[in-house]
């Protein structure tokens, strides 16, 4: 194997490790969403909080900008995470019988 191919294999291994960590973090975020649902239910709060969502998007877009990440990546990524969080929280809501 050439040096370039070994370098490519190492870089792919780094991608694989990063991807695994991203998935672990998404799973952790979903676990927090489930706990958040319990708190919101106990306190009679709505699952969807547009003001909090807007503040979070502004924060992550600013963070992304500082990291030289394009907004075209950051915003859709976090909109997807927010939608998933809301879905997870709604799944925790007791069903009416």
Model-found features: residue ranges?
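Domain-level signature for soluble enzymes in the chorismate/prephenate branch of the shikimate pathway
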Residues: 1-97
């Amino acid at each position: 194997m050439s040096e370039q191919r070994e370098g490519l294999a190492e870089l792919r291994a780094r991608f694989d490790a990063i991807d695994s960590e991203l998935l672990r973090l998404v799973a952790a975020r979903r676990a927090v969403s489930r706990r958040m649902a319990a708190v919101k239910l106990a306190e009679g709060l709505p699952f969807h909080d547009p003001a909090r969502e807007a503040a979070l998007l502004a924060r992550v877009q600013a963070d992304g900008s500082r990291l030289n990440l394009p907004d075209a990546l950051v915003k859709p990524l976090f909109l997807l995470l927010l939608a998933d969080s809301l879905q997870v929280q709604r799944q925790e809501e007791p069903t009416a019988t």
